[in-house]
A protein has these predicted regions:
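Amphipathic alpha-helical transducer elements in NTP-driven molecular machines
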Residues: 143, 168, 189-192, 196, ...
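Acidic-glycine-rich active-site phosphate/pyrophosphate-binding loop
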Residues: 66, 166-176, 264
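Short alpha-helices
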Residues: 90, 169-213, 225-229, 234
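Short acidic active-site motifs
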Residues: 121, 145, 167
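Short, acidic/small-residue loops that bind anionic groups at enzyme active sites
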Residues: 154-169, 384
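Phosphate/diphosphate-binding loops
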Residues: 132, 136-150, 154
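Short, ordered loop/turn segments at secondary-structure junctions
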Residues: 79-80, 108-111, 138-139, 161-164, ...
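Hydrophobic helix-and-loop "lid/oligomerization" segment in the mid-to-C-terminal part
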Residues: 2, 9-131, 152-153, 204-384
């Protein structure tokens, strides 16, 4: 029995109110991507959603302000993917630019620590002198870790974008656009986007408190962090809604103009990408995988160090390390695929018997598993 297949056509939104002077093809493309108004085509920073709509952000910036004034040791705890690496680097760079000198970071090791702010990671932060923990791209499910930090007298600010569970960790402040009581219109911010909004809010709070005037310094231009926002947003494959399109476009524009971190320049070089011709797909398929390779095979601290690096020469060395890890990752995945295909071929006789004797069809595919396959690569391999 031959199975019939049909591609489903996604109809464009005919109610979209787009500019009349747009070419018909562009109108259809925009409408098919869910763009319904001219406002959603805005690409300037003026079109960004205001940070004031993020619940919990006012409490977070007040805690950070007091930490700045008191010289509190702040540890940023990130995640071991590209979004986590860019979130970590952005938060450290942002707070340093805002006038905080007593700050460092910690990225859990996927193989030794597992995901998120676990009690073990809290102990590591404590050993590094943490007096305040700020999570980025994780923490919304870290109930045990936050509780453990509380017993040690370490307050925690959670910044995350993952969906919350039925209960929230007992943190001093939580910023997540997907909280049930959060009125922030975009629910698609990546972790790096949430971290960027926190820096925007903190700069405003510090300025209103006279922080910059007291130190006779100018408020930093946080647009300089948008290259990291673009990279993390695209690499995390979050939907590019109107707000994320602005963040990504602005970051891409800075990279194309050569106004980006040395680490991103080094990644572009090792990937043979021309910055002036850079597209969002390059962030997702060239730079992102090289960053992710560190977290999948080794330690994402290498990726964060690359993004924090101020020297292009040092950045090139780190980018070469990531490129080598990515090549190893590809070779391992190819081996996994070859093994899986051999397994599937050996099952062909079984599949034929299903069809001939029981008159049924396997619709949902075949699950392949091996205890020798690397856990960190299984999700990528499965997607292929």
């Amino acid at each position: 029995m031959k199975q019939q297949r049909q591609l489903r056509r996604r109809e464009a939104d005919e109610t979209a109110e787009l500019p009349a002077d747009l070419p018909p093809l562009l109108r259809r493309l925009y409408a098919s991507r869910g763009v319904r108004s001219a406002r959603e085509l805005e690409r300037s920073v003026k079109g960004m959603l205001p940070w004031q709509q993020l619940s919990g952000i006012d409490n977070a910036v007040e805690i950070l302000y007091n930490a700045f004034r008191e010289g509190t040791r702040i540890i940023v705890v990130g995640d071991f993917d590209a979004d986590g690496a860019t979130s970590t680097a952005l938060s450290v760079l942002g707070m340093r630019a805002l006038g905080c000198d007593n700050i460092s970071y910690l990225v859990p090791n996927r193989f030794e620590d597992g995901y998120g702010l676990s009690p073990e990671v809290v102990d590591q932060a404590k050993a590094r002198g943490a007096q305040l923990i700020v999570t980025v791209d994780n923490g919304i499910s870290s109930h045990a870790g936050v509780a453990h930090a509380k017993t040690l007298g370490i307050p925690v600010i959670v910044t995350d974008h993952h969906l919350p569970g039925d209960t929230l960790p007992d943190a001093e402040a939580i910023i997540n656009p997907n909280l049930r009581d959060c009125e922030f219109p975009s629910k698609s911010l990546a972790g790096v986007g949430v971290a960027f909004y926190l820096m925007l809010a903190l700069r405003t709070f510090l300025r209103d408190k006279g922080w910059f005037d007291e130190r006779n310094i100018a408020p930093p231009n946080l647009a300089e962090l948008l290259d990291l926002v673009a990279l993390g947003t695209v690499a995390d494959v979050v939907p590019l809604d109107a707000n994320n399109r602005i963040l990504t476009w602005q970051g891409l524009s800075r990279i194309r103009a050569g106004k980006c971190r040395p680490g991103i320049k080094a990644l572009l070089e090792i990937s043979n990408r021309d910055p002036q011709q850079l597209a969002a797909s390059d962030l997702g398929f060239a730079l992102g995988p090289r960053l992710n390779a560190a977290g999948r095979l080794d330690d994402m601290s290498v990726g964060v160090a690359l993004l924090l690096c101020d020297n292009l020469g040092e950045a090139r060395v780190l980018a070469s390390e990531l490129d080598a890890l990515n090549q190893t990752r590809k070779e391992i995945e190819q081996g996994m695929q070859a093994e899986a295909l051999i397994l599937c071929e050996s099952l062909s006789a079984v599949v034929k018997r299903f069809r001939a004797v029981w008159r049924c069809i396997i619709l949902n595919g075949i699950r392949a598993w091996s205890e020798f396959w690397r856990r960190a690569l299984k999700s990528v391999f499965t997607a292929r």
